[in-house]
Amino acid sequence: MGVLKTDEWLKVSLKNPLEICRKIKKLFQEDSEQRVYNYLARNGMYKYNARIQNDFAKLLENKVWDKVEGFFKRYKKLWDGPNIPIFIFPHGSAGFFHSNKGNKSGLAFKDKMFLFYTPGLSDRELEAVFVHEYHHVCRLNFLKKEINDYTLLDSIILEGLAEHAVLKNVGVSFLAEWTRFYSSDAALKLGTKYIKPHLQLRKNDDLHDQLLYGLGRFPKMIGYSCGFHAVTKRKKNKYISEIATLTKPSEYFLEDYFKD
């Protein structure tokens, strides 16, 4: 499948994202395009305003759809990844996680992927978002675990491994800002307090996302940061191939991180 022609959809329905979501609601086993749109908008999809028309034109001018198709072909071969549909839309500024993920973001599932971009991103910045999200897609498929069985442990390691894929394939300059929020010592100290007691928390528990993203009273992006530093420490102590980052269980990457 690869990159779908959402640019053609946007040429017709840019002002009406609900019409776009009507096309994809079956992929979410959902009968309401409004609920699909609300979910996507919380995670980065645009809300139409005067700026979006210009943003879309610049994304077209930058040939973003063609570039992402090139990334897909490369990494699908490199990681023996699944052939999934990829949806590209302009990024909005009012997403729930906007302050944590800046002017670009994505969503990954076993069977589909969404990328939300603003104009002005370099090719390497475009690639970094793609690599992070497609690494998720590949790992979700290789692990063969039902999404409702995922725990906070699985989630933090998923994020840490994906950002290490960015480090390896795109470069240190293109790591997400959250990788620099805490030093390794600070992340370990905070993780021991907030993350360690809840590693087996299921994904559908409200506390899961609060800890993963560092919402409310919790340190900002502490789950993400802990996962990144745990993988960093594991890689320092033991060689891990890139394919192993897709197939090894989460527990493997947390060995010796939280020491009693």
Description of each model-found segment:
Residues Y150-K189, K259-D260:
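Post-HExxH zinc-binding segment in Zn-dependent metallohydrolases
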Residues K196-D260:
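Pan-zinc metallopeptidase signature
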Residues N49-F109, D123:
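Auxiliary, metal-adjacent structural segments of Zn-dependent hydrolase domains
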Residues F114-V129:
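Short pre-active-site segment immediately N-terminal to the catalytic Zn-binding motif
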Residues A128-N141, E163:
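Active-site recognition of the HExxH zinc-binding catalytic motif
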Residues M1-N49, Q53-D55, L59:
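N-terminal low-structure segments adjacent to metalloprotease catalytic domains
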Residues E127, D154, L158, G223:
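Hydrophobic (often cysteine-bearing) scaffold residues that line and stabilize catalytic clefts
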Residues N141-Y150, G171-E177, N237-E242:
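Inter-helical turn/loop segments and adjacent helix faces that build the functional surface
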